[in-house]
């Protein structure tokens, strides 16, 4: 009996973009272990480095905003049952009230946020949430948020599919030119799903794992083991350039990296800019939605 399900095949396919039969073979080889199956596909040259997060499936929005002088920012995710709700003005008013409450009152977590008086109302966030559930007719949940202090720029991508908040260390006033630069950086993070800021932020275990997979991939391609390590080092350099924000090519101008774009902007504005940190939330990240028809299709092949 297979050590995995039709849903596992579906999930692996979504994570890697590989064909159904390749995914089934990988899961069989890995005895149902999802991460090992991903590594198997990569070692065979069938899949690129997969971001090991479940498929985006929940509805609602990821939203990001700042206060008036861009000295405090928040990125927040609020989930609902259907994508229709994300276009509902009443739902978006609730999301914005939650974000403003986080900016003004700095709750430690969602549980504390629910107890606070919602910005611009006389109700607690929990009371306002229950009111929205009743009037909209769907279950609504505040899933997570992150708040930052200091120069911040917020960006909402594709109508709430993802929200990005970028925090900067700078001696430059956050004016229109600075915000335009900051939004370029945030858009890059949103579009490429950038996982790390710098090479130093990549965990050692991630690099070791990448090296192991890359080395096996090189050997499977028929390269001599004697030169495998040298090839792997070149591939690791490429990994950094693809996954570390400051080393990435700027999507609007691939002749410069994000670090170079940052330095050039700072020079033009007469000061210094350093990207301190960033957070990207994607709507429904890690939440699965059932797809019975697809699962049945896969099951019929097992």
Regions found by a protein language model. Give the residues of each.
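N-terminal assembly/interaction segments in proteins that build large macromolecular machines
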Residues: 2-302
């Amino acid at each position: 009996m297979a050590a995995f399900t039709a849903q596992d095949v579906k999930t692996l396919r979504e994570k890697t973009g590989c064909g159904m039969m390749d995914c089934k073979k990988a899961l069989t080889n890995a005895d149902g272990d999802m991460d090992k199956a991903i590594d198997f596909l990569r070692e065979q040259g069938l899949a690129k480095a997969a971001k090991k997060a479940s498929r985006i499936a929940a509805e609602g929005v990821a939203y990001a905003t700042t206060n008036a002088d861009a000295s405090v920012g928040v990125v927040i995710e609020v989930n609902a049952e259907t994508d229709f709700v994300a276009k509902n003005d009443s739902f978006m008013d609730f999301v914005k009230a939650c974000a403003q409450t986080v900016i003004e009152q700095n709750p430690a977590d969602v549980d504390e946020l629910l107890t606070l008086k919602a910005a611009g109302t006389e109700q607690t966030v929990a009371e306002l949430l229950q009111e929205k559930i009743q009037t909209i007719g769907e279950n609504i949940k505040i899933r997570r948020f992150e708040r930052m202090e200091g120069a911040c720029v917020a960006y909402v991508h594709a109508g709430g599919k993802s929200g990005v908040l970028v925090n900067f260390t700078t001696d430059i006033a956050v004016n229109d030119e600075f915000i335009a630069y900051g939004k370029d950086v945030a858009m890059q993070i949103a579009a490429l799903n950038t996982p790390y800021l710098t090479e130093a932020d990549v965990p050692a275990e991630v690099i070791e794992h990448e090296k192991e997979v890359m080395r096996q991939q090189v050997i499977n391609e028929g390269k001599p083991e004697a030169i495998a390590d040298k090839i792997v080092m070149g591939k690791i350099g490429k990994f950094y350039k693809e996954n570390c924000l400051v080393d990435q090519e700027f999507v609007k101008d691939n002749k410069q990296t994000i670090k170079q774009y940052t330095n050039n902007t700072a020079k033009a504005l007469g000061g210094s800019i350093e990207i301190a940190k960033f957070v990207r939330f994607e709507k429904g990240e890690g939440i699965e939605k059932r797809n019975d028809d697809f699962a049945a299709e896969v099951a019929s092949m097992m």
